[in-house]
Curated annotation (Swiss-Prot):
SUPFAM superfamilies xrefs: Ribosomal protein L36 (SSF57840)
Ribonucleoprotein among keywords: yes
BP GO terms, sorted: translation
Protein name: Large ribosomal subunit protein bL36
MF (Gene Ontology): structural constituent of ribosome
PROSITE patterns hit by this protein: RIBOSOMAL_L36
Keywords, alphabetical: Ribonucleoprotein, Ribosomal protein
Protein origin, superkingdom: Bacteria
GO cellular component: cytoplasm; ribonucleoprotein complex; ribosome
Keyword check for DNA-binding: no
Family indicated by similarity: Belongs to the bacterial ribosomal protein bL36 family.
Coiled coil (UniProt feature): none
NCBIfam families reported for this sequence: rpmJ_bact
Amino acid sequence: MKVRASVKRMCDKCRVIRRHGRVMVICANPKHKQRQG
């Protein structure tokens, strides 16, 4: 899980979602998981 000020899709499988007011990226590739913070 990467914590970044700016979350961006890293590939075409990445999905940008909101969970509990946080912007997150979920993907089939675990290396692409990101959270805004």
